[in-house]
From Swiss-Prot:
GN (gene name): rplA
Originating organism: Borrelia recurrentis (strain A1)
Family as reported in the entry's similarity comment: Belongs to the universal ribosomal protein uL1 family.
Domain of life: Bacteria
Database matches in CDD domains: Ribosomal_L1
The name this protein goes by in its record: Large ribosomal subunit protein uL1
Family annotation (HAMAP family): Ribosomal_uL1_B
InterPro entries: Ribosom_uL1_bac-type (IPR005878), Ribosomal_uL1 (IPR002143), Ribosomal_uL1-like (IPR023674), Ribosomal_uL1/biogenesis (IPR028364), Ribosomal_uL1_3-a/b-sand (IPR016095), Ribosomal_uL1_CS (IPR023673)
Keyword Repressor recorded: yes
Amino acid sequence: MAKSGKKYIQALSKVNKLKSYNIDDAISLLKEIKFVKFDETIDVSVNLNLKKNHTVRETLVLPHQFMKEKRILVFAKGEKAEEAREFGAAYVGDDDLINKIKDGFSDFDVVVATPDMMKDVGKLGPILGKRGLMPNPKTQTITNDLKGTIASLKKGRTEFRANKNGVINFSVGKSSMDSKKIRENYDEFIKELLKRRPSDLKGTFVDSVYVSSTMGPSVKIDFV
């Protein structure tokens, strides 16, 4: 939805575009200029200085959860399938589940697979890849440790990644949350992001950081 209209312009007028705010002041400002009734998401947008060969991607569990519990789909057989069911996966199967997805089933948020299933799961590449849900070792979603993986996903483990333009968009809270909790989620995200600086990168890694709410204007962060 385009950000426009009288209320948006009024909110925008309260943001000093020539100023970089510290994160605490920025969060307070976003709460102050909120003009919609629903509980907005607080988002962080980071512009990175990356080369074409650089990949920045990581998973983390934020200290304060705010999103609804993810619907976990697991590809597994035998004892591993039973393990996935026992620890709370929403959907568990092998060939039957693969065929169901081919037929259009999409009522899930994250996909996990045991290594032995990947040969068959790979056939779903065009479908799962389009949604960014293809199991991947980098996101710890190809694993035999279904108990640990499902537990961490239920706790809110989520992923961030830089797009082709070197931008990461990541949510750190809801406008209704305590400001301190939003700040702590932001700090955890930034801490994990800085660990992913490419080893061969010269110069600045983070060019700029902005925070915004779903419908509100962005606020530049004084990032050092």
